[in-house]
Amino acid sequence: MTEPTIKLNYHKTRFLTSAPDIRHLPEDNGIEIAFAGRSNAGKSTALNALTNQKSLARTSKTPGRTQLINLFEVEPQCKLVDLPGYGYAAVPEQMKLQWQKALGEYLQKRDCLAGIVILMDIRHPLKDLDQQMIEWAVSAQLPVLLLLTKADKLSQVARNKTAKMVNEAILPFQGDIQVEIYSALNKIGVDKLSNKLDSWFAPIFQQEGK
């Protein structure tokens, strides 16, 4: 049976809540898709480009500002989750440990998590923590979309070369992993991101018989 094609309007996305840890999140139901990445990978900027809302997700020149788990509702039962950024050295150690704990708990215990978008600066892809995140997602049998962000910083030739390198480097993970080039500034890859999210959200509409 062919899966129905759905097309969600991400421009209607609204902020739902922030939580310091999994215990303060809403009920674990519907479908959630998480956005994860290093503190300077441009997660908030990517979310704002997807939703066409300049300030939906708070951005800052200071990496590491996203200290909470932030939830956004696209439609009832369909949520995007902006996870705390990882790997920023200038953050106090105690705060870093708190973030890592919140991140780990969410990823391990949230049943409605259906996919992970891992964002990496195209100029510095596949750092150790990025690879750990990919490894975890694959072991949890979750599909992964790797977004190579800030693509406007490179020429098209350099972008394609990096994407090819990343595609080759992830083969040993043997998971459901897709690589896309992304630029919030030039709107490169926004449609591919929304199409992937649509496919991950689709089961909720099948359940509801829509």
Curated annotation (Swiss-Prot):
- Biological processes, Gene Ontology terms: division septum assembly
Q: Which Gene3D superfamilies does the protein's record reference?
A: P-loop containing nucleotide triphosphate hydrolases
Annotated InterPro entries: G_ENGB_dom, GTP-bd, GTP-bd_ribosome_bio_YsxC, P-loop_NTPase
EngB-type G domain span: 29-203
Protein name, entry field: Probable GTP-binding protein EngB
Residues annotated as binding Mg(2+) are S44, T66
Keyword terms: Cell cycle, Cell division, GTP-binding, Magnesium, Metal-binding, Nucleotide-binding, Septation
Q: Which cofactor does it need?
A: Mg(2+)
Q: Where is the signal peptide?
A: none
Task: Provide the species name.
Answer: Haemophilus ducreyi (strain 35000HP / ATCC 700724)
The record's family statement is: Belongs to the TRAFAC class TrmE-Era-EngA-EngB-Septin-like GTPase superfamily. EngB GTPase family.
